[in-house]
Amino acid sequence: MKQISCFIPYASKEQADKTIRALETETEVHDVNRVETSLFRTQTIKEIAAQATAEYTLIYTKETPLRLGYLALQRLIRIAEDTGAGLLYADHYQVRDGEEQKAPVIDYQSGALRDDFDFGSVLFFNTKALKESAEKLTVNYRFAGLYDLRLVLSLSYELLHVGEFLYSEVEEDCRTSGERQFDYVDPRNRERQIEMEQACTEHLKAIGGWLEPTFESIDFGADGFETEASVIIPVRNRATTIEAAIRSVLCQKTAFKFNLIVIDNHSTDGTTEMIDRFKDDERVVHLIPTRNDLGIGGCWNLGVQSAACGKFAVQLDSDDLYKDEHTLQTIVDAFYKQQCAMVIGAYQMTDFELNPLPPGIIDHREWTEENGRNNALRINGLGAPRAFYTPILRRITLPNTSYGEDYAMGLNISRRFRIGRIYDVLYLCRRWGGNSDAALSIERLNANNVYKDRIRTWELQARIRMNREALKTTE
């Protein structure tokens, strides 16, 4: 039974013919349509929805050949009929440099608001759901049309991950995860990002998760702190980088007293001995946890809960350096000037010898006072260096993980408090083969993305509840 209308991007006859022929041989395919305009334009989405005549609609998003698995379309139809889902997407294979590799994807959550969420290249829609959702698209986007569609679709239908390998595609972007992770802050993508933010903002308003730009005030009068600021460095097995990181802290010139708290998480490579070289400097506090179950977030909590921690807790990763001796003073000044619970600066990507690397300066200029904390639910990070007002940090605490813990804290703080921004470079982020996120496996990348999406889901739920409670008090 022919139940599927197919739509494929058409750049040239040579490019599209192979996929067209493959689809036309499938007994479930009703018609194959060439799409000559961008699939990311709202107008294109509306045209596809209008042209789709079969019960289901398959949109293929790549211009490289598609090879369907054995009875793959039958399987998608069966699951679609059983579940009533609005969109199905599946695990698949990718051909990279001539080699076929597994490319599993992850489940969709309400907090999976990233515009780069990986659905794969085969999107299998219930046509009724597609048409209903396309009719609700009110903004004519150039870049965010497909993103807007899935946000609108998710309001009424399930977006269902089929955990089976149902097709093969050719992957042309062979960069590592470490190279791809900064695409969203690349200035060349700015126009696209503006549209994505607008679409996400409208979605948050539709579900009651958008926050107005009103913030709780901060009282910096908390006493009991012997120092104004503490730099926090969690570290494990970074003997080659920790000394330079420590020295970049100790050279800071400030008008206040500060210290450095290094949480040495049971290093075995000489890192402990390297830190001990600074034991005669009273500013250096060397903590070794008594327990063995701490991630980076847990190490941060240990340092922040320490009596030695100052009024402000400032980040420095053990791989990285402060740009100059004024970084700490600049950050602390920003707390008082901007009246915020958290301050985030800008950083420069470099190699180990401090030569600049693309994309260069990461300053998150997409952040605005009016909408920054809402857009934070869409983007994959908030920037660095990060600094916190210690009483608030102690009250909330970071998750005891080694990925996403800082992002979770930033989202939580931004729910109620202002986040301050410094757009000058304060920090040098050194990329090298030892970085934990330099080139992640697909399994590790998926696990990271699932966790960050879960963080967003929890935060979104908290914001929706907060808005509902606020509404009750005004009724």
Show which residues each predicted segment covers:
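A conserved hydrophobic helix/loop-capping motif in glycosyltransferases and polysaccharide synthases
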Residues: 3-13, 26, 229-241, 245, ...
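Conserved donor NDP-sugar-binding/catalytic core segment of glycosyltransferases
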Residues: 70-102, 326-359
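A conserved acidic beta->alpha catalytic loop
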Residues: 11-15, 37-39, 65-66, 264-274, ...
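Short, flexible, basic/aromatic active-site loop/helix in glycosyltransferases
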Residues: 96-121, 359-379
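Short beta-strand-to-loop acidic/aromatic patch adjacent to the donor-nucleotide binding site
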Residues: 54-67, 310-321
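Short, acidic, metal-binding catalytic loop of nucleotide-sugar glycosyltransferases
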Residues: 19-30, 247-257
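Glycine-rich, basic loop-to-helix element that forms the pyrophosphate-binding segment
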Residues: 39-52, 290-308
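Acidic donor-binding loop at a coil-to-helix junction in glycosyltransferase catalytic cores
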Residues: 140-149, 402-409
